[in-house]
């Protein structure tokens, strides 16, 4: 599958495909993963600069997190195609591996992003002693995307579906083994509608508005 080309300056560069699952060649996946790793390394080096303005630090940090997720998707595809399993490789790839504020989500802060107003204080604070309501407000101040709420990209949906099918089969077997111990009026839980991306964005927008209002009042 050929990819489109774009030009940065005078050097033509191959644009990585968005539909990672459509790439069925391990060498091509490896090439794109290497490209992502190179982009991450450059941005991690840049975010260490003492001359960067605050808005560029935030944009760079967001970009690094997006690239980290893309790297993970390529590694999943490489593994599924029978290539190297990078997911179990704990070798350090980057000079800065980033830090999480808490285990609530996987968003990481790199370089000078850890010194941003509000972020630095959160790293210094012991989040376990902050009341739940205040902790939620602090998390809402960040740019949360669908990943934060557990909505995975289409490229990984098949993996989740396979996992859910396996768990569902195990649960059915478990219930069959229980026999008469299962209550007669037991009914399976039916989820009629899963939120769309637009629904998630609307929820996030509403939460941001509420967070701003709580800070103003």
UniProtKB/Swiss-Prot annotation:
The keyword Cytoplasm applies. GO terms for biological process: generation of catalytic spliceosome for second transesterification step; mRNA 3'-splice site recognition; mRNA cis splicing, via spliceosome. InterPro entries: Helix_hairpin_bin_sf, Isy1, Isy1_sf. It comes from the Eukaryota. Pfam families: Isy1 (PF06246). It is found in: Cytoplasm; Nucleus. Keywords: Cytoplasm, mRNA processing, mRNA splicing, Nucleus, Spliceosome. GO terms for cellular component: catalytic step 2 spliceosome; cytosol; nucleus; post-mRNA release spliceosomal complex; post-spliceosomal complex; Prp19 complex; spliceosomal complex; U2-type post-mRNA release spliceosomal complex. Involved in pre-mRNA splicing and cell cycle control. Belongs to the 40S cdc5-associated complex (or cwf complex), a spliceosome sub-complex reminiscent of a late-stage spliceosome composed of the U2, U5 and U6 snRNAs and at least brr2, cdc5, cwf2/prp3, cwf3/syf1, cwf4/syf3, cwf5/ecm2, spp42/cwf6, cwf7/spf27, cwf8, cwf9, cwf10, cwf11, cwf12, prp45/cwf13, cwf14, cwf15, cwf16, cwf17, cwf18, cwf19, cwf20, cwf21, cwf22, cwf23, cwf24, cwf25, cwf26, cyp7/cwf27, cwf28, cwf29/ist3, lea1, msl1, prp5/cwf1, prp10, prp12/sap130, prp17, prp22, sap61, sap62, sap114, sap145, slu7, smb1, smd1, smd3, smf1, smg1 and syf2. Interacts with sde2. PANTHER family: PRE-MRNA-SPLICING FACTOR ISY1. Belongs to the ISY1 family. This is Pre-mRNA-splicing factor cwf12.
């Amino acid at each position: 599958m050929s990819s489109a080309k774009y030009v940065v300056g005078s050097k033509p560069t191959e644009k990585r495909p968005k539909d990672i699952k459509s790439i069925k060649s391990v060498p091509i996946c490896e090439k794109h993963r290497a490209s992502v790793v190179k982009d991450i390394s450059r941005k991690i080096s840049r975010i260490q600069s003492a001359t960067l303005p605050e808005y560029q630090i935030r944009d760079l940090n967001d970009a690094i997190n997006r690239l980290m997720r893309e790297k993970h998707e390529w590694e999943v595809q490489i593994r599924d195609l029978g290539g190297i399993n990078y997911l179990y490789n704990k070798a350090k790839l980057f000079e800065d591996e980033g830090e999480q504020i808490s285990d609530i989500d996987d968003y990481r802060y790199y370089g000078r992003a850890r010194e941003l107003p509000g972020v630095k204080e959160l790293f210094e604070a012991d989040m376990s002693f902050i009341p739940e309501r205040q902790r939620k407000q602090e998390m809402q101040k960040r740019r949360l995307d669908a990943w934060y709420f557990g909505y995975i990209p289409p490229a990984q949906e098949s993996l989740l579906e396979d996992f859910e099918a396996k768990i569902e089969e195990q649960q059915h077997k478990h219930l069959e083994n229980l026999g008469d111990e299962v209550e007669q009026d037991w009914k399976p839980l039916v989820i009629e509608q899963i939120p769309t991306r637009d629904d998630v964005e609307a929820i996030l927008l509403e939460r941001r508005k509420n967070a701003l209002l709580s800070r103003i009042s």
